[in-house]
Amino acid sequence: MKRTFQPNNRKRAKVHGFRARMKTKNGRNVLARRRLKGRHSLTVSSEK
């Protein structure tokens, strides 16, 4: 049986990236909460 996690950086950014989060109201809420919590990394695409 195939495993569920098949790594793919492009898909990762498209689904969980900063621009993907900014597209929706809820995504922006996620970013706001992570800022309030003081997360070291906001999204997977902000690793640079």
Swiss-Prot record:
GO terms for biological process: translation. InterPro entries: Ribosomal_bL34, Ribosomal_bL34_CS. GO terms for molecular function: structural constituent of ribosome. GO terms for cellular component: ribonucleoprotein complex; ribosome. The keyword Ribonucleoprotein applies. It holds the Pfam family Ribosomal_L34. Gene3D superfamilies: 1.10.287.3980. Keywords: Ribonucleoprotein, Ribosomal protein. Belongs to the bacterial ribosomal protein bL34 family. PANTHER family: LARGE RIBOSOMAL SUBUNIT PROTEIN BL34M (PTHR14503:SF4), MITOCHONDRIAL RIBOSOMAL PROTEIN 34 FAMILY MEMBER (PTHR14503). This is Large ribosomal subunit protein bL34. The lineage of its organism: Bacteria, Bacillati, Mycoplasmatota, Mycoplasmoidales, Mycoplasmoidaceae. The gene is rpmH.
